[in-house]
Amino acid sequence: MKSTINRRKALKLMGLGMLGTCMPQLPAIAKDKKEKKDKKIKRLIFYFSATGNSLYVSRQLAGENGVLLSIPQEIHKENPVYEAEEIGIVCPVHCFLPPAMVQDFIARSTFKADYFFTVGTFGAHTTVFPEFMNNFAKGYGIQMNYISAVQMVDTYLPYFDVERELADPKLKKIPETLAVITAAINNREEYMLPVSSMDRMIYEGYYRQSGRDRQRPTVTRSEKIVFSTDACIGCGVCTSVCPHGSWSLVNGKSIAKGDCENCLACVHNCPQKAISIIPTPPEPEEPNRNVRYRNPNVSIADLIRANSQI
């Protein structure tokens, strides 16, 4: 007799299978990097990525000879020392600043290079991001030579409808912007993205209205901002894409409890769209719960390898 399987169960099995195939590869990645330790690395890029935009940009900047390391994986090392000819940080711009985990990683690590660069990925505005990153890095003995940013899909769901973002003409400029940035870094140019008076006005207005912390604005507790709905099938993808490992499966359903970066990796990568955001005034409710985003050049497996804390 032929057995049947519904879509819900099939997706659950796919999710569990994906976790199983991704997890064994983590030690292999670490091993590859260890083997290269004795060789002088040309370009070393550290990245933080929730929906794949920053990972995609990192790959483009790395080229054939660059080495990529995930910040959520590297941050657990004690007193790490990294050395390369060029060292870069690629991360999303969260509330006009680098994510708290990126700040913590820089503060805990020692970097040795002839050339340092930062590239942010953002949707609407960078405002003071270049200045903040430059001053923050300088406080830990790093002189940034180059700071720029790439405008991409804005994935912050309380304010942006992903469906509209995907239709925005700004996305057509991504290849050109990346080409300019890559050429500049290859030539070791000295540059910092300008911060205008309008940028400062937007920054000040946002923080006055929101009341967020101006150093670590997105740090919170996961149970305060996200929850899984009845659409959850217990596939476990959220437990592996969270850079803090703050999701767990309890009786076949995902439960969020723990530190949160507010990166929304869990929300965007859930195959069932079963994770929703709890509105935090003055922020509105998300305008479109039916559309989620992951960079088309990055797979869920890529993000699991980058972020999993299991």
Describe every region a protein language model picked out.
Residues 202-234, 239-240:
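A mid-sequence, solvent-exposed acidic-amphipathic segment
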Residues 25-50, 56-63:
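C-terminal segment of N-terminal export signals and the immediately downstream linker at the start
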Residues 2, 9-30:
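N-terminal export signals
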Residues 28-30, 227-261, 265-283:
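Iron-sulfur cluster-binding cysteine motifs and their immediate structural context
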Residues 265-310:
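Flanking helices and flexible, charged tails adjoining ferredoxin-like Fe-S electron-transfer domains
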Residues 119, 150-176, 246-249, 253-257, ...:
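Soluble, non-transmembrane catalytic domains of enzymes that act on hydrophobic metabolites at membranes
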Residues 72-152:
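Helix-loop-strand module that forms the ligand-binding subsite of alpha/beta enzymes
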Residues 156-203:
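Glycine-rich phosphate/pyrophosphate-binding loop and the adjoining helix
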